[in-house]
Amino acid sequence: MSSTASQQPTQGSASEPVQSLTPAELVELARAAREHAHAPYSRFRVGAALETRAGRIFTGCNVENSSYGLSMCAERVALFKAISEGEREFTRMAVIADTPERMPVRPCGACRQVISDLMGPDAEVIMANLRGELEAHSVVELLPAPFDRSYF
């Protein structure tokens, strides 16, 4: 699967529920997206796979820039790709990187804020490493006090 394409793993009419992927399947799509990462500076390659309520999958990888602040994390790439294609309702995201044992990768603070704003508090984030270790948390568990619409 290309990190630039979306995948629709299941088909269904508006009246029949869409069967979502297992956590392991979503992580595997994130792992495949990781292969496309552009990380010449940190060599820290990250992949993400985002599932919409309709069952569509959007993947992303991190893309680094020599001006580090212009780099983009895999989680935001996947979310922005989905938003740009008209999706607005998300259920889960998987993110994977090569992290030490017993430490699945965790989204950075900027990604947690964007995830919170675009996915909502009850969506699930599945964090994984290449050793097969998984950890899942709700968005509100990752960012319990977000800067959100209530400030406006």
Predicted regions and their residues:
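Short, surface-exposed loop/turn motifs that are enriched in glycine and acidic residues
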Residues: 16, 39, 67-69
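Short beta-strand scaffold segments in enzyme catalytic cores
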Residues: 43-52, 126
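Short glycine/proline-enriched turns and hinge-like loops at secondary-structure junctions
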Residues: 42-43, 72
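Zn2+-dependent cytidine deaminase-like catalytic core
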Residues: 59-152
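Short, compositionally biased leader-like segments
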Residues: 1-28
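Small-residue (primarily alanine) positions within well-ordered alpha-helices
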Residues: 30, 48-49, 78, 82
